[in-house]
């Protein structure tokens, strides 16, 4: 058992009274939660419970689509990212996201990393080479691709492609890393590599992962939040959530009685 407690952690994200609407239908209901800095927080729950919606609020990706609205407060470093004046470019530089299916750009491995950086910073050639290497090392991919950086990224295996997407995201040096079912399309060996990588990434980043795989949440995360029908039912350290949950709904889900 660990001795983790949200009360003793430094807060990275504070969620207050968050509600979310699709076409005027409420899908998140008065969410209050704290995301601690440089820890891994897993969000679990049955399909349609709102966990991916919550994740997408953290970088406001929903703003790309019509008739979607978030209300309440999401404080990143004490600033409300939902405020009208909060810059989207600033938010995207602070909060990176990796999706369920790896989507490498149809270009070289090197350009997959440098392309994203060029849109945010002006670096010399040497600085860019160093940044690309750092990102690939950070995603545990460098040793596998260092001799074929000019080859197409689409030729990588599924697991390598997902690590490339992680490298592309961390190359921008965000503060928060969002992972939406990052291993659901991968084989067990690739999944194991990604899980090991996730545990290493928390040394530099605050990590939030949405997963249907409860074993993955138990293995990787420091804290776990259980959601059901748009509500946050329980949130605490992972050991407690999985062994001594305080809510019956949480216990029923974890023990397989529904979901």
Curated annotation (Swiss-Prot):
Coiled coil: none annotated. ATP binds at residues 45-52. Keywords: ATP-binding, Cell inner membrane, Cell membrane, Membrane, Nucleotide-binding, Phosphate transport, Translocase, Transport. PROSITE patterns: ABC_TRANSPORTER_1, ABC_TRANSPORTER_2, PSTB. One of its GO terms (molecular function) is ATP hydrolysis activity. It catalyses: phosphate(out) + ATP + H2O = ADP + 2 phosphate(in) + H(+). Residues 13-254 form the ABC transporter domain. InterPro entries: AAA+_ATPase, ABC_transporter-like_ATP-bd, ABC_transporter-like_CS, P-loop_NTPase, PstB-like. GO terms for biological process: phosphate ion transmembrane transport. Pfam families: ABC_tran. It is a peripheral membrane protein. It is an enzyme of class 7 (translocase). The keyword Translocase applies. It is found in: Cell inner membrane. One of its GO terms (cellular component) is plasma membrane. Its EC number is 7.3.2.1. The keyword Transport applies. The complex is composed of two ATP-binding proteins (PstB), two transmembrane proteins (PstC and PstA) and a solute-binding protein (PstS). Belongs to the ABC transporter superfamily. Phosphate importer (TC 3.A.1.7) family. Part of the ABC transporter complex PstSACB involved in phosphate import. Responsible for energy coupling to the transport system. This is Phosphate import ATP-binding protein PstB 1. The lineage of its organism: Bacteria, Pseudomonadati, Pseudomonadota, Gammaproteobacteria, Pseudomonadales. The gene is pstB1.
């Amino acid at each position: 058992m660990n001795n983790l407690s949200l009360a003793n952690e430094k807060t990275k994200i504070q969620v207050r009274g968050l509600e979310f609407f699709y076409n005027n239908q409420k899908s998140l209901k008065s969410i209050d939660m704290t995301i601690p800095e440089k820890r891994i927080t897993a969000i679990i729950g049955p399909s349609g419970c709102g966990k991916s919606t919550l994740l997408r609020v953290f970088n406001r990706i929903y703003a790309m689509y019509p008739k979607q609205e978030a209300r309440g407060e999401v404080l990143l470093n004490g600033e409300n990212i939902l405020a009208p004046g909060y810059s989207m470019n600033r938010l995207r530089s602070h909060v990176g996201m990796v999706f369920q299916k790896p989507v490498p750009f149809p270009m070289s491995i090197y350009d997959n990393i440098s392309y994203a950086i060029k849109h945010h910073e002006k670096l010399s050639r040497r600085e860019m080479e160093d940044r690309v290497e750092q990102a690939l090392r950070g995603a545990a991919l460098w040793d596998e691709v260092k001799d074929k950086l000019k080859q197409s990224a689409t030729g990588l295996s599924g697991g390598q492609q997902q690590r490339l997407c992680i490298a592309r995201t961390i190359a921008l040096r965000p503060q928060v890393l969002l992972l939406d079912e990052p291993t659901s399309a991968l084989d067990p060996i690739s999944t194991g590599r990604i899980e090991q990588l996730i545990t290493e990434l928390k040394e530099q980043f605050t990590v939030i992962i949405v997963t249907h795989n409860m074993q993955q949440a138990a293995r990787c995360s420091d804290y776990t939040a259980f959601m059901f029908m748009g509500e946050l039912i329980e949130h605490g350290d992972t050991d407690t959530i999985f062994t001594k949950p305080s809510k019956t709904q949480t216990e029923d889900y974890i023990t397989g009685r529904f979901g």
